[in-house]
From Swiss-Prot:
Keywords: Cytoplasm, Nucleus. This is Host cell factor C1 regulator 1. Residues 1-34 are annotated as: Disordered. A motif (Nuclear export signal) lies at residues 91-100. Its main location: cytoplasm. It comes from Bos taurus (Bovine). Pfam families: HPIP. InterPro entries: HCFC1R1. Disulfide bonds: none annotated. GO terms for cellular component: cytoplasm; nucleus. The lineage of its organism: Eukaryota, Metazoa, Chordata, Craniata, Vertebrata.
Length: 119
């Protein structure tokens, strides 16, 4: 990215690239008037980015604040942490039963053979 001064219009309506040319200054660089252009090179950008930090340690940042915890501290993680699962998903239950070697107990009691629904 190159930053430079805006172009000025001369008396004839054409754009002048160097305002010193209109005042009669020589075409060379004048030591009394610094050039106000800043050229950013790849090396300058690499140096700039290598100095950046992901931590909140920049001088323009406010001191780090302690944020309140999102969840209150757990007294007993085993008894208080409950993960919700979709009620229709029986795969985890089947895997648990396979690991334990138990026979599955049906969620709904089996109806007697004589109780059949008529449609």
């Amino acid at each position: 990215m190159i930053l430079q001064q805006p172009l000025e219009r001369g008396p004839q309506g054409r754009a002048q690239r160097d305002p010193r040319a209109a005042s009669g200054a020589s075409g060379g660089l004048d030591a009394r008037e610094p050039l106000r252009k800043q050229f950013l090179s790849e090396e300058n950008m690499a140096t700039h980015f290598s100095r950046l930090s992901l931590h909140n340690d920049h001088p323009y940042c406010s001191p780090p604040r302690a944020f309140p915890p999102a969840l209150p501290p757990l007294r007993s993680p085993c008894s208080e942490l409950l993960l919700w699962r979709y009620p229709g998903n029986l795969i985890p239950e089947a895997l648990r039963l396979l690991r334990l070697g138990d026979t599955p107990t049906p969620h709904y009691p089996a109806s007697p053979a004589g109780d059949m629904m008529e449609l």
